[in-house]
């Protein structure tokens, strides 16, 4: 059975978010096309996603010195445990659907923190004499991103940092098969906002058939 993680990073629901509306349309269509698959929702705004901080570095230092989990402080244990949970959940899935808004040319900070929980040497990638090699090959991902302007092409494509960073990190850990759906231009062309949303939903439903 294929396991799909529906990873969202938006404090708004589908009623208040173009991206979430498209994401939920995709998941609904996916479930209809693949009723045997398991879909798990991870709302990053309601999930413990530790940032890499002094506690985390201290914990890693203790592990490197040969000390065990019991040597960590309570704060270190809580953060490391949460990071491990996020990592293990991600590693044991087969498909990933990220739904994010663009905030100031990137995605919400919690997405970066989440990716930092995933890019762990010896778990999702390894170092070799020829450079790092991703360990999550054979998996695939979809990124649905909503932007007020148009960033998929033209002069502003170069500053779509969230899309580029997510694709780069996923590729680094071995997830090289990625799809992208842009829900864009709603603020630049408010009179076409509903049309843009409906077109993106149609695109998402079609993609769900072969994802």
UniProtKB/Swiss-Prot annotation:
- What are the entry keywords? Flavoprotein, FMN, NAD, Oxidoreductase
Question: What catalytic activity does the UniProt entry give for this protein?
Answer: 2 a quinone + NADH + H(+) = 2 a 1,4-benzosemiquinone + NAD(+); N,N-dimethyl-1,4-phenylenediamine + anthranilate + 2 NAD(+) = 2-(4-dimethylaminophenyl)diazenylbenzoate + 2 NADH + 2 H(+)
Q: Which cofactor does it need?
A: FMN
Asked if the Swiss-Prot or TrEMBL record annotates the protein with the keyword Oxidoreductase, the reply is yes
Q: How is the cofactor bound?
A: Binds 1 FMN per subunit.
Q: What is its EC number?
A: 1.6.5.-, 1.7.1.17
Q: Name one GO molecular function term.
A: oxidoreductase activity, acting on NAD(P)H as acceptor
Q: Which domain of life is it from?
A: Bacteria
Which residues are noted in the entry as FMN-binding? 102-105
What job does the chain carry out?
Answer: Quinone reductase that provides resistance to thiol-specific stress caused by electrophilic quinones.
As for family, the record states: Belongs to the azoreductase type 1 family.
- Report quaternary structure and partners: Homodimer.
Put simply, this protein is called: FMN-dependent NADH:quinone oxidoreductase 3
State the species of origin.
Bacillus cereus (strain ATCC 10987 / NRS 248)
């Amino acid at each position: 059975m294929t396991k799909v993680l529906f990873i969202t990073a938006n404090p708004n629901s589908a009623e208040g978010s173009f991206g979430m509306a498209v994401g939920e349309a995709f998941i609904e269509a996916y479930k209809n096309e693949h009723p045997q698959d398991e879909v798990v929702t991870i709302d990053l705004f309601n999930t413990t996603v530790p940032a890499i901080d002094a506690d985390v570095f201290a914990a890693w230092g203790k592990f490197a010195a040969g000390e065990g989990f019991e040597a960590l402080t309570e704060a270190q244990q809580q953060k490391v445990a949460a990071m491990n949970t996020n990592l293990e959940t991600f590693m044991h899935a087969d498909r990933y659907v990220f739904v994010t808004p663009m905030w100031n040319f990137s995605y919400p900070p919690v997405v970066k923190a989440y990716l930092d929980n995933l890019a762990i040497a010896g778990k999702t990638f390894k170092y070799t004499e020829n450079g790092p090699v991703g360990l999550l090959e054979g998996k695939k991902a979809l990124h649905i991103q909503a932007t007020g302007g148009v960033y998929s092409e033209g002069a502003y494509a170069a500053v779509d940092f969230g899309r580029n960073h997510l694709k780069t990190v996923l590729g680094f850990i071995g997830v090289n098969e990625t799809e992208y759906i842009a829900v864009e231009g709603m603020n630049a062309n408010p009179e076409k906002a509903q049309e843009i949303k409906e077109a993106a939903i149609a695109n998402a439903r079609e993609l769900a058939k072969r994802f």
